[in-house]
Amino acid sequence: MASLKKNGSSSRLQDRKPPNLSITIPPVEGERDPKLMQPLTKPVFQKSVSLQEPRGHVAEGGTADVRPGFKRQTSLSQSIKRGTAQWFGVSNDWEGKRQQWQRKSLHHCSLRYGKLKPQYQRDIELPSQETPSFQATESPATHRLPKIVDPLARGRPFRHPDEVDRPRTPHVGLPPQTPGMLSLASFTSVRSGYSRFPRRKRESVAHMSFRAAAALIKGRPILDTPHSRKAGQKRSFIYPSFMDEDTVDAAETLDSSFFSKVDMHDETFSMPDDVFDSPPMSASYFRAPLPIPELMPGAAIEAAKEPVKSVQVYTPDHRRGKRIASQVKHFAFDRKKRLYGLGVVGSWLNRTYRRSISSTVQSQLEHFNSHRPYFAYWITFVHILITILAIATYGIAPIGFAQHTTSELVLRNKGVYESVKYIQQENFWIGPSSIALIHLGAKFSPCIRYDEQIKNLIEKQHGLERESGCCIQNDKSGCVQTHRKDCSETLATFIKWPEHDAPVLDEVTGMKRTSGAVCHQDPRTCEEPASIQPHVWADDITKWPICTYQAMNNHTGIRHMDCEIKGRPCCIGTKGSCEITTREYCTFMHGYFHEEATLCSQVHCLDEVCGLLPFLNPEYPDQFYRLWLSLFLHAGVIHCCVSVVFQMTVLRDLEKLAGWLRISIIYILSGITGNLASALFLPYRAEVGPAGSQFGLLACLFVELFQSWQILAKPWKAFLKLLGIVLFLFLFGLLPWIDNIAHIFGFLSGLLLSFSFLPYITFGTADKFRKRAMIIISLLVFVGLFASLVIWLYVYPINWAWIEYLTCLPFTNKFCEKYDIDQVLH
């Protein structure tokens, strides 16, 4: 009978129990399973009794204290394989991570690509599950009935439903509702404090001694007065010592709830299912007394109906002080989620989700958090810093779209002043000149690989230098290395071997030298390096080394050695051209003057123009690191501002979705691929900036749109809007100083990399295999594209003149000046 009675009452309680409520009652001490009372065979492996065991963790067999068996440690190859599969999102145990990716995807889509379908939109509006809450165990909410707050919960760590996605700021004091109802949790809850302030723990002797010593050193009284405590700095959160565990008597709780008056209108909406929704404990300490209409006189009632401008609630000294401003807390704790497919651009384009979306996709959005945009902030800081340093070091070039010409009277080789012109390309970005940008690390093909055209130009200059000689002025004003046609037959004497006192090349045969002479350099007088066997200087002045030490200076008896030299090599321009001229002319032309050399063949002008690290072989440029170094440079202030705006909107938004590692890989590889293509098709144009990287990020938006196609309400409208933005940017790239080639190939590489690295929502089990195939195909195509560009750049260079029209349209004759090899442009 007792068992039947017990079973009957249990069934009645089971019928009244809410469907989602689970209550675990521990067994009575005397009714434990005898199997659990038996000692273990290996007491060494018993768990400590001082640790609190979590509920629901006991195995079915009743062996709660038995540890699981030992497992073999996974090998390094298996760990790498599993980690790689998880990173690409194709592992077998990736279900939880996939749900997080898909929740974040919907958040991003709702902000970037427009309105979603209604079922996806409802899933986004569900409360977040980031923090522990009992909302998942509540019964379904009834319509047109407000939630009832239990006044007897007394500070349990529950939160309001509308608080879950907001910062954890203290609540405004709410009056207790349903004062006559007493819940079971009210008698057993700890960490209480609903009706009174929790007591403070005593300070330790060490803490009080340290505080007294600090007070004596600072000259303050040891015992604080109430006034000094009041003047101290307040805190918005109480110390942990205030939150000691103490059980409050139920009668005291009933008293506090009984004297809390509420309106009877709220009493009629009491529901047992919502009794667990209680305000946070901080709300109970600052409740302002509410006016009771039946106890107030008529004048007071009229005054109470007027709007209250400001209410100041007095709080005692022992309670917490001033709170942090709500604006500061919202700024500090605000972590807005990014909906997949609805990011910043989606909010600009007014995208939404569609209505018909399966519940499987909705369930994937519940644990989807946004990443911190560390890479966006870092790259923006680096861009701003480098731009400031570049402008401070090299200054600002003439502003405009055409060429800038400067004229000035400059002392030339013949000792007379001549009017010379200096032509340079204008920069409308408000920044350094192209020479300065090349020196800083701009993308410039002659500095990256061996260029056949530049090599032919240098060989042509060396051929002319072999026929040169020393032109000595008859008035003994000086001498200069030049050609016969540039030396006056009346006012000067042209010294050329073997016509004028040529030295002997071979002592055995008596053959004399035919290449020379060279002003201020002769094999007979140079001692370092000396022209002796077996290191005799060749009969070709273009192969002579620089003489670092002369035995006799001005009294050798050799005419081209005793004269005063007027010109030395000067590297001018960006193509490695060299002239023997004066220092004044070299400075005016923004060249590099070599005081130690006497011939242009003794200097390597291309190494001087490129700067940075010297070439391993001066004849073969090898600065391939310019392909990614130029991503951190900008052509000017406006260029940098455009990049900052793009990175603070699009880049930061995408990084919140995919994380810094995936976005940084796409950013860097897209930029390198774009610069590689630009170096191939536009070899003689100095380009800087992350143009390819930015268009690679725009390709990420397209991939995200394609993967969110099934959940968007109007996907074609979002696609056309995004396509219009990209086409406008491509048309804008037809202006000079904007690299459209880097835009195109950066977009293609970003498209391929996004299919491999970006997460996206899956619609069924077949999507897993589809994603694996997509990753493999995308990576293979990207590797093939990158390898083809490298081979074309270093092995089989391509020179297509028509491709320049893709990056600049010549609206005028000088709007897009060609950077061919024959022009001396800067």
UniProtKB/Swiss-Prot annotation:
Ranges of compositional bias, category Basic and acidic residues: 159-168
Ranges annotated as spanning the membrane: 381-401, 627-647, 663-683, 686-706, 718-738, 744-764, 775-795
Disulphides: none
InterPro entries found in the cross-reference section: Inactive_Rhomboid, iRhom1_2_N, Peptidase_S54_rhomboid_dom, Rhomboid-like_sf
Gene Ontology cellular component annotations, sorted alphabetically: endoplasmic reticulum membrane; plasma membrane
Residue ranges of the region described as Disordered: 1-38, 51-78, 153-180
Biological processes annotated in GO: negative regulation of protein secretion; protein transport
Membrane topology field: Multi-pass membrane protein
Residue numbers on the Cytoplasmic membrane side: 1-380, 648-662, 707-717, 765-774
Keywords for the protein's UniProt record, in alphabetical order: Cell membrane, Endoplasmic reticulum, Growth factor binding, Membrane, Protein transport, Transmembrane, Transmembrane helix, Transport
Cell compartment(s), UniProt: Endoplasmic reticulum membrane; Cell membrane
Predominant localisation class: endoplasmic reticulum
SUPFAM superfamilies, per database record: Rhomboid-like
Lumenal side: 402-626, 684-685, 739-743, 796-826
Keyword Protein transport tagged: yes
Superkingdom of this protein's organism: Eukaryota
Family note: Belongs to the peptidase S54 family.
PANTHER family: INACTIVE RHOMBOID PROTEIN, INACTIVE RHOMBOID PROTEIN 2
Purpose: Regulates ADAM17 protease, a sheddase of the epidermal growth factor (EGF) receptor ligands and TNF, thereby plays a role in sleep, cell survival, proliferation, migration and inflammation. Does not exhibit any protease activity on its own.
Name the record gives this protein: Inactive rhomboid protein 2
UniProt gene name: rhbdf2
